[in-house]
């Protein structure tokens, strides 16, 4: 992933990021640190095509992420800090969402559930936030996306 000349304005007009350039290398682990409200989540959402930069570009495999092409989105998965899960079982969730990720591996997913000591719950919406995160991390890892 390449981020080129990225500008993200604050609501008050001062840029959060002004002309940032960054290359994310495959197989590497990165940390994103900063104060609350400084734009960490905004940057991640832009990297996933969920928000769009004011100026600059974010490319994955040479394609602008903001185009939201299926062949790009199937290679990216984000586990956000805050999220809701629908009132369905984890099996229904997997059935409905794994089709968007061609490298999804159900055996890996089941192993992650076992590692996290999670059951195939009947209603994801009624689980604790900690359990929801474990379910979503299990799904995310099993997608085998590069990012």
Where do the PLM segments sit?
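ABC-family P-loop ATPase nucleotide-binding domains
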Residues: 78-136
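Conserved hydrophobic segment flanking the Walker A/P-loop of ABC-type ATPase nucleotide-binding domains
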Residues: 24-25
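Helix-to-loop junction immediately C-terminal to a conserved catalytic motif
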Residues: 48
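The feature captures the beta-strand-to-loop junction immediately N-terminal to the Walker
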Residues: 33-35
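ABC ATPase nucleotide-binding domain "signature" region
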Residues: 31, 132-142
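Conserved structural motif at the start of ABC-family nucleotide-binding domains
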Residues: 1, 16-19
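Short coil-to-beta microelement around the adenine-binding A-loop and adjacent beta1/P-loop entry
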Residues: 13-15, 70
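Conserved ABC transporter NBD signature motif
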Residues: 56-67, 71-72
């Amino acid at each position: 992933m390449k981020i080129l000349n990225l500008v993200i304005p604050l609501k008050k007009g001062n840029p959060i990021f002004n002309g940032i350039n960054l290359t994310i290398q495959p197989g590497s682990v990165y940390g994103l640190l900063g104060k609350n409200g400084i734009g960490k989540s905004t940057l991640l959402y832009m990297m996933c095509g969920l928000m769009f930069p004011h100026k600059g570009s974010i490319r994955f495999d040479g394609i602008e992420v903001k185009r939201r092409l299926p062949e790009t989105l199937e290679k990216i998965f984000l586990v956000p800090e805050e999220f809701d899960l629908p009132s369905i079982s984890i099996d229904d969730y997997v059935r409905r969402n794994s089709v968007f990720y061609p490298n999804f591996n159900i055996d890996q997913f089941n192993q992650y559930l076992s590692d996290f000591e999670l059951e195939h719950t009947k209603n994801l919406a009624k689980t604790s936030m900690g359990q929801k995160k474990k379910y979503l991390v299990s799904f995310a890892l099993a997608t085998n996306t590069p990012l």
